[in-house]
Amino acid sequence: QPKSTPTLTMFPPSPEELQENKATLVCLISNFSPSGVTVAWKANGTPITQGVDTSNPTKEDNKYMASSFLHLTSDQWRSHNSFTCQVTHEGDTVEKSLSPAECL
């Protein structure tokens, strides 16, 4: 089975959620093979371990996909310049960043 590096897509928190003082970031990890991935989150480059929830990979068309969620408060979301979802797969590291300033 050929190796396929994951594609990352980041979704910011919804405005409705922010009004409730919550912020959930979603990192969609898709089109990878084999299924082993390690997900790490960072805020301004500093690793975050609390509030992280990563799904088990599911198979779709011979490739795998997974999602990772980062649960924050809206204050935490606004108080950082960038959030990064970093995925390690078969020795390769792929990362995608999201900036709260771009999502206002």
From Swiss-Prot:
It comes from the Eukaryota. Residues 6-99 form the Ig-like domain. Disulfide bonds join C27-C85. GO terms for cellular component: extracellular region; plasma membrane. Pfam families: C1-set. The keyword Methyltransferase does not apply. Keywords: Disulfide bond, Immunoglobulin domain. Signal peptide: none annotated. The keyword Lipid biosynthesis does not apply. InterPro entries: Ig-like_dom (IPR007110), Ig-like_dom_sf (IPR036179), Ig-like_fold (IPR013783), Ig/MHC_CS (IPR003006), Ig_C1-set (IPR003597), MHC/Immunoglobulin (IPR050160). This is Ig lambda-3 chain C region. It comes from Mus musculus (Mouse).
